[in-house]
């Protein structure tokens, strides 16, 4: 029974990629928990899920700068699966990257993509490798923001159903202050993932910033649209901190007073979040409440 619970917990963390948001202490705890579980001999763990968890362990070790241990995990994968799967390619590029060889990682991935990989492999393989290449170029400052955007947009033309590409493009447009284009990209994300509450929240936030620099009539229209998206985000996730904060802030920007139902409801929900949620959300909710 205990093994079942641990297995499901670890698989959930992997499926949701929650570990990518963990702090160093949480990563260490996860690493230790995974190593203990993997040695426990769970007969219900399928081979597919075993490699699934080993993949997570690899990236946890990378995040913790345990490059030697990460190499050991990679070698285990390579010995069992070979080097040709896209996950192995991305792992190898990651190892090159953490060992300070960004140039080598970039050349390795570019060579793969240029050797007719676009036409000889499946969609998942090509786009996964292409996204990894862009990520390395971005972190290594190998490309300007405009050049990164150009590559991402080119990929959205080839792979219009990849939500992650549209999200990434929206983030770049947002940083550049091109809010209208950022909104368009987020709307594409929602066409692909219509129940993505975080995307509704981000769209609301982007519309809000666009409204702040617009003329009065357009400003009101944009704020109303931003509020609608914020409300949709909390409809999908009842205790979504960012969503309720946006509901409160946008309602106030629209000139509604403290007795307005939405302002009272959002304040009540922020109080609930500050009492129930994790420490990070509690602190953030309390800061927002102090300002309103």
Positions of predicted regions on the chain:
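Short coil/turn linking the two alpha-helices of tandem helical-hairpin repeats
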Residues: 17-18, 62-65, 100, 139-142, ...
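N-terminal alpha-helical scaffold/docking segments in eukaryotic complex subunits
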Residues: 1-69, 278, 283, 287
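Canonical positions in the second alpha-helix
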Residues: 77, 112, 154-155, 188-189, ...
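Long, ordered, amphipathic alpha-helical scaffolds
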Residues: 219-292
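Short coil turns that delineate tetratricopeptide repeat
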Residues: 82-83, 117, 124, 160, ...
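TPR alpha-solenoid repeat register
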Residues: 53, 86-88, 121-125, 129, ...
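Structural register within alpha-helical repeat arrays
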Residues: 56-57, 92, 133, 169, ...
């Amino acid at each position: 029974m205990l093994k079942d619970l641990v297995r499901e917990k670890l698989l959930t963390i992997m499926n949701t990629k929650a570990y990518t948001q963990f702090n160093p202490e949480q990563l260490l705890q996860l690493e230790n928990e995974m190593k203990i579980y993997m040695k426990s001999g769970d007969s219900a763990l399928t081979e597919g899920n075993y490699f699934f968890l080993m993949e997570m362990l690899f990236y946890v070790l990378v995040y913790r700068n345990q490059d030697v241990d990460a190499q050991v995990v990679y070698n285990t994968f390579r010995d069992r699966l070979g080097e040709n799967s896209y996950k192995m390619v991305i792992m190898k590029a990651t190892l090159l990257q953490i060992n300070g060889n960004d140039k080598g990682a970039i050349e390795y991935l570019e060579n793969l993509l240029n050797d007719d990989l676009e036409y000889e492999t499946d969609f998942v393989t090509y786009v996964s490798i292409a996204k990894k290449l862009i990520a390395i170029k971005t972190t290594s400052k190998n490309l300007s923001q405009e050049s990164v955007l150009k590559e991402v947009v080119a990929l959205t033309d080839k792979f219009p159903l990849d939500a992650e590409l549209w999200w990434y493009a929206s983030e770049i447009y947002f940083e550049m202050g091109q809010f209208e284009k950022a909104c368009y990209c987020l709307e594409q994300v929602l066409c692909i993932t219509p129940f993505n509450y975080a995307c509704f929240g981000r769209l609301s936030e982007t519309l809000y910033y666009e409204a702040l620099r617009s003329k009065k009539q357009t400003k009101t229209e944009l704020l109303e649209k931003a509020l609608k998206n914020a409300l949709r985000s909390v409809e999908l996730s009842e205790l979504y901190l960012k969503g309720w904060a946006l509901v409160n802030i946008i309602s106030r920007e629209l000139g509604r007073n403290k007795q307005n139902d939405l302002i009272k409801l959002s304040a009540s929900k922020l109080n609930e979040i500050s009492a129930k949620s994790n420490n990070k959300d509690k602190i953030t909710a309390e800061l927002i409440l102090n300002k309103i």
